[in-house]
């Protein structure tokens, strides 16, 4: 049934996306048209009408008049429209041409705003590619098929990714990001799905483990025979009482009864020190031997109290993460509990339903989907160890989001390079846009979206960058074809032959030559930094061991990174990257630049061999090459 509903929805969406193919004729909208609103418009209707008027003003060169009465040539907004939305899902919309006029309305909190942005994108070709790049062509008129009738239901109730542009309000509105953890959208703008009291890893604070560690060590997890503040004991009734008290305190202070959904995160700390005490072990053994059993039981009891207190629009959120990833047996989450399944151990060069590398996760996904009414996902989309390198997951982004939707997932957060202001190389803006569009519609024409982005962001050279991205995707994964989020730089892509590497270099040169503005050239060079980092890590092209100028090329790469504003090479660099020992820069691969000193034994060995390779090529160059490949 789920698959059937999915296919029907996709078919309806596609019909709405390409109505021209089925139109007998078009209606023509120009600057003489008016925007029709109700006599007493709501704040949401006023916002929607103003947004539409402002953008149409940019299109036509004259802002259309907003009126409360019109007989013809109008776009009706909200309650002024005649569309029937009774069968439209919450936060969905309907855009329909009726008697030659356009009628736009939506449901629940966000539907109307989503509808206006969809109208602008679909019929005015408005695209918000980044927080700084919005494309809105000027036209004398807009053509809309006379039989247009677009009905849309959101694929997910909560969507989020970070990077840089997704933090921007207008970007979030245009591209359908709804989670409130990284953005603030006022109620009239559609609002957000808000986490109250913290987004993740909250259980230590809620259970006050530091406060009670000395007076009540039994509140702490017993792990490997020792009590630790890493996690609390989830079968201790006093711990449950403390946590419940603090959840209720958060709700007393921050709850909004008018919000459609608010979430309190009761999520395990970021470690694997789950409690192994006798009570926890017995409970887990009684539920399939799964550590998630104590987690689900714990949050279920909190959720019951929250519901009893009348917080009907509140859900309690918890993780299925590392030790709690697999679903338990004989216990199910309450209907006001969110299970947030994390894909942290997955391979990202293959779709998540690939048995060879992701079979365990996919089983966990389907198991949770069977027992959980509100399944959320925490997904990943960058190399957190070496973020400056290429992370070629481009071919799985859309497929994975489709897999989540088809397995009853209700909310999705794709964690990316959230520290992009400190480490902006690679294809951060492109990947953020790809993710956002797929969250908005997992079945969109992603190739067309990527082409449009590349043209806008990289300029005329965008077509060459797109070819490069496609080549990187084909090389995704190490020698075993896997790609994980803590891989060494060179292992993120299978080796390029010298011919292939030179071809990629040539495409970068063509892209730079085609650029028409300094901004386009800067965007190209910034993305190219990731390719240069990968080549330096894999000893390719100008970074070959057989090139005596290899140290100078690495020095140039390092200086270009600093000039581009890069002050971190990964999630946790741990040192001042502007003050790295010059010897490391010149004679070690970039993956060793994290350490910032020569104390690392492997780094010392590599530097010695590289110095010999520079002094005595080509013999030691060959030795250095094989040493690096073996020990990378």
Describe these PLM feature segments.
Residues 10-99, 130, 134-149:
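Acidic, contiguous N-terminal accessory segments
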Residues 43, 48-51, 55, 59, ...:
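Feature activates predominantly on carbohydrate-active enzymes
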Residues 231-241, 249, 359-463:
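Structured mid-domain segments that build the active-site/substrate or prosthetic-cofactor binding neighborhood
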Residues 272, 278-316, 331-337, 343-347, ...:
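Active-site neighborhood of glycoside hydrolase catalytic domains
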Residues 299-326, 375-382, 412-415:
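Aromatic-lined carbohydrate-recognition surfaces of secreted/lumenal glycan-active proteins
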Residues 317-345, 389-393, 422-431:
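Substrate-binding cleft/loops of secretory-pathway carbohydrate-active enzymes
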Residues 327-334, 341-383:
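Glycoside hydrolase catalytic-domain groove-lining segments
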Residues 435-630:
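Catalytic domains of carbohydrate-active enzymes that cleave complex glycans
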């Amino acid at each position: 049934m789920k698959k059937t509903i999915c296919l029907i929805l996709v078919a309806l969406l596609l019909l709405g996306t390409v109505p021209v193919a089925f139109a007998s004729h078009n209606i023509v909208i120009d600057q003489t048209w008016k925007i029709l609103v109700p006599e007493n418009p709501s704040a949401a209707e006023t916002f929607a009408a103003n947004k539409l008027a402002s953008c149409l003003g940019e299109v036509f060169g004259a802002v259309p008049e907003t009126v409360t009465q019109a007989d013809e040539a109008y776009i009706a907004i909200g309650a002024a429209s005649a569309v029937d939305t009774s069968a439209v899902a919450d936060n969905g919309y309907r855009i329909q041409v009726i008697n030659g006029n356009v009628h736009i309305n939506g449901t629940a909190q966000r539907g109307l705003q989503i509808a206006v942005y969809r109208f602008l994108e679909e019929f005015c070709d408005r695209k918000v590619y980044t927080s700084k790049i919005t494309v809105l062509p000027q036209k004398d008129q807009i053509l809309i098929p006379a039989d247009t009738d677009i009905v849309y239901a959101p694929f997910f109730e909560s969507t989020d990714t970070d990077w840089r542009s997704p933090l921007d309000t207008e970007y979030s509105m245009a591209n359908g990001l709804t989670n409130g953890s990284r953005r603030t959208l006022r109620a009239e703008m559609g609002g957000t799905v808000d986490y109250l009291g913290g987004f993740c890893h909250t259980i230590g604070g809620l259970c006050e483990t530091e406060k009670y560690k000395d007076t009540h060590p039994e509140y702490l997890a017993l792990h490997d025979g020792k009590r630790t503040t890493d996690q609390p004991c989830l079968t201790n009734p006093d711990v449950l009482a403390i946590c419940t008290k603090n959840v209720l305190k958060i709700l007393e202070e921050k709850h909004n009864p008018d919000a459609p959904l608010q979430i309190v995160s009761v999520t395990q700390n970021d470690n694997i020190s789950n409690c192994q005490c006798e009570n926890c072990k017995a409970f887990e053994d009684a539920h399939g031997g799964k550590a998630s059993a104590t987690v689900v039981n714990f949050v279920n009891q909190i959720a019951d109290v929250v519901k009893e207190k009348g917080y009907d629009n509140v859900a309690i959120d918890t993780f299925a993460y590392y030790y709690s990833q697999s679903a338990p047996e004989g216990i199910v989450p309450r209907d006001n509990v969110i299970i947030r399944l994390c894909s942290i151990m997955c391979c990202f060069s293959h779709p998540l339903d690939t048995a060879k590398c992701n079979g365990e996760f996919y089983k966990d996904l389907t198991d949770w989907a069977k027992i959980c009414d509100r399944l959320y996902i925490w997904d990943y989309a960058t190399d957190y160890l070496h973020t400056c390198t290429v992370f070629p997951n481009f071919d799985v982004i859309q497929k994975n989001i489709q897999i989540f939707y088809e397995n009853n997932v209700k909310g999705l957060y794709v964690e990316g390079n959230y520290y992009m202001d400190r480490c902006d190389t690679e294809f951060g803006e492109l990947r953020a846009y790809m993710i956002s569009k797929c969250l908005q519609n997992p079945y969109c024409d992603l190739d067309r979206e990527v082409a449009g982005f590349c043209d806008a962001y990289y300029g005329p050279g965008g077509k060459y960058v797109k070819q490069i991205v496609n080549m990187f995707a084909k090389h995704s994964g190490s020698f075993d074809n896997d790609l994980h989020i803590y891989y060494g730089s060179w292992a993120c892509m299978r080796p390029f032959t010298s011919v292939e590497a030179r071809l990629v270099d040539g495409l970068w040169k063509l892209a730079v030559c085609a650029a028409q503005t300094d901004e386009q050239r800067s965007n190209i060079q910034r993305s190219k930094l990731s390719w240069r980092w990968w080549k330096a890590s894999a000893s390719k092209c100008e970074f070959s061991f057989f090139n005596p100028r290899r140290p100078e090329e690495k020095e140039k790469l390092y200086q270009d990174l600093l000039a581009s504003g890069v002050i971190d090479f990964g999630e946790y660099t741990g040192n001042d990257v502007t003050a790295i020992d010059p010897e490391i820069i010149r004679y070690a691969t970039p993956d060793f630049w994290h350490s910032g000193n020569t104390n690392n034994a492997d780094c010392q060995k590599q530097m010695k061999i590289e110095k010999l390779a520079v002094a005595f090529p080509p013999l030691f160059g060959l030795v250095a090459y094989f040493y690096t490949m073996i020990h990378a």
